């Protein structure tokens, strides 16, 4: 089922995993279950009955008490990723709405595939914009970086010259910021 509640203890475990990765807050959607629309069967802290006498409400309350006890010890903690994966919205739009060479190529799928590789090896990853400070990372991945805007190739070259490792894949560097093909060779 798509709208099932989390299993007992699952929300707590996921919340602590989030805190362990540097989160300073745990937020819930939705607080109160909707009475209409497509979200009326989504899980929520407060069910349709409107009472605090539910397993979910009790688990959220208990988690709140636990986090209150340890809050000062974990607030502001960080997990410094050594890998950055570039996600660029303009690249997404240009690639998603191009008519070729392959209409089935999906930017987000390629990003997710790259992310999953590192995730499955328990390697922390930051999703970073195209204009990020790459020097913070040992490795920067730019899957299907179809659109290479002015200054990006130079920025990535400088990163590699300084000792960084860049991974890119097919369909990278094909067009500039106006979605026109680079003439005279790709950067």
Segments and roles (model prediction):
Residues 1-187:
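Carbohydrate-binding surfaces of carbohydrate-active enzymes
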């Amino acid at each position: 089922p798509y709208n099932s509640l989390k299993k007992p203890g699952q929300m707590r475990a996921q919340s602590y995993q989030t805190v362990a990765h540097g989160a300073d807050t745990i937020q819930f959607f939705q607080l109160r279950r909707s009475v209409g629309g497509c979200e009326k069967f989504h899980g929520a802290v407060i069910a349709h009955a409107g009472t605090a006498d539910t397993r979910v409400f009790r688990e959220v309350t208990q988690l709140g008490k636990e986090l209150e006890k340890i809050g000062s010890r974990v607030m502001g903690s960080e997990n410094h990723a050594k890998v950055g994966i570039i996600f660029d919205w303009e690249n997404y739009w240009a690639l998603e709405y191009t008519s070729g060479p392959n209409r089935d190529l999906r930017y987000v799928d390629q990003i997710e595939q790259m992310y999953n590789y590192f995730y499955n090896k328990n390697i922390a990853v930051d999703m970073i914009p195209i204009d990020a400070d790459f020097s913070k990372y040992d490795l920067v991945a730019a899957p299907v970086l179809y659109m290479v805007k002015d200054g990006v190739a130079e920025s990535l070259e400088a990163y590699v010259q300084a000792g960084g490792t860049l991974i890119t894949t097919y369909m990278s560097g094909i067009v500039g910021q106006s979605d026109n093909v680079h003439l005279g060779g790709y950067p």
